């Protein structure tokens, strides 16, 4: 059993509707979507391989941001180690391979990826992108919105508490009295 090293990329571009992720159709298949990736050539790093594969497979230029994670998986009986990198879309390039590409939202990409490990890589990318844009990761947006709503309700309820008069004729809220 052989072991080989690959470089892969999660390429994203920011749109008004949020980040969109690049997926390419897997070689020799129909409607199986994957991240661009390929075998590390001699005298090449995994990051350089990932950049090359993005250009060759998808016809996209990208700017590396950081390494995401390494994934070990079995492919055609051999183990491969894939180092994934987060990359930002930087324009079009001339593709060397005839593959279909798709730019998908987080939810669409999760649905399109069939490997659990690829989904984990996408979740890591989404988390990092959301930190950089100030936007919450997709799966936490509802939870955060509910927390903000609950906080708003509590603050609103505190504002409705009756005020009491102090000896000097000024009013004090119950919040200040409880805190003081």
Question: Where does each model-flagged region fall?
Answer:
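N-terminal strand-loop-strand
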Residues: 1-35
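Charged phosphate-binding loop/patch that engages nucleotide di/tri-phosphates or the phosphate backbone
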Residues: 117-180
